[in-house]
């Protein structure tokens, strides 16, 4: 798999228009591109101008195909003056779960007229010391297995690694609601992971985007299943 982790800051007063344009790109991508499995759009709960995408593709070629689509061009043209500052983009490989997990967001028969956007999602970059990357990955994979297999409220606990900078990892966590995330923070597996990796970060962790799913709605497929690797 290839994943694009993208973070934006949007100019004041333009977030709603940006999100409407982004939803058009998301629908076009997941609905029409065979190599695009997810195009998740997240809005931070505390700062609505902070918005993130998690885009999942079959491979690098599928990303290149996406970039040439009319819906992508329409989104880019519509939003180019709405973005405040540089866009953070990281092209990644999946570390956890593996390719056999459930990646496809599509679900037949979803009626978006009855949609809800009540999930709680974390979109976080983790800078890791170069000599601790492998150890960090092993530790966070154990947390991922515990989260997705032992917590009914954890739908995804994905770990990604930037393909051009192996020290840059990403977490993409999806919970059924904020209460499920609070439960996650009390579990033994996250306590063990936090203690294990506490000294393995390379400087300060950038502020994560934590908030709701703007698109797709809750009724789509968000779960990775119960992956063990």
Language-model-detected regions and their locations in the chain:
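N-terminal/domain-start segments enriched in small and hydrophobic, helix-friendly residues
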Residues: 7, 11-13, 20-26, 45, ...
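Extended intrinsically disordered, low-complexity coil regions enriched in Ser, Thr, Gly, Ala
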Residues: 16-20, 32, 134-140, 149-152
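Short structured motifs
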Residues: 37-38, 107-109, 141, 155-156
């Amino acid at each position: 798999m290839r994943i694009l982790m993208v973070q934006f800051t949007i100019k004041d007063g333009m977030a709603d228009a940006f999100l409407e344009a982004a939803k058009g790109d998301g629908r076009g991508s997941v609905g029409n591109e065979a190599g695009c499995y997810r195009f998740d759009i997240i809005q931070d709960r505390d700062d609505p101008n902070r918005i993130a995408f998690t885009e999942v593709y079959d491979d690098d070629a599928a990303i290149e195909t996406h970039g040439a689509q009319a819906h992508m061009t329409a989104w880019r043209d519509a939003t180019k003056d709405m973005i405040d500052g540089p866009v953070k983009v990281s092209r990644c490989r999946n570390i956890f779960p593996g390719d056999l997990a459930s990646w496809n967001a599509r679900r037949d028969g979803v009626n978006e007229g009855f949609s809800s956007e009540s999930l709680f999602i974390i979109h976080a970059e983790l800078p890791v010391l170069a000599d601790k990357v492998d150890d960090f990955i092993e530790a966070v994979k154990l947390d991922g297995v515990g989260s997705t297999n032992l917590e009914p409220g954890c739908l995804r606990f994905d770990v990604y690694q930037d393909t051009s900078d192996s020290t840059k990892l990403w977490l993409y966590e999806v919970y059924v609601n904020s209460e499920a995330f609070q439960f996650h923070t009390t579990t033994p597996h996250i306590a063990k992971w936090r203690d294990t990796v506490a000294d393995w970060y390379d400087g300060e962790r950038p502020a994560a985007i934590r908030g709701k799913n703007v698109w797709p709605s809750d009724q789509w497929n968000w779960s990775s299943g119960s992956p063990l690797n």
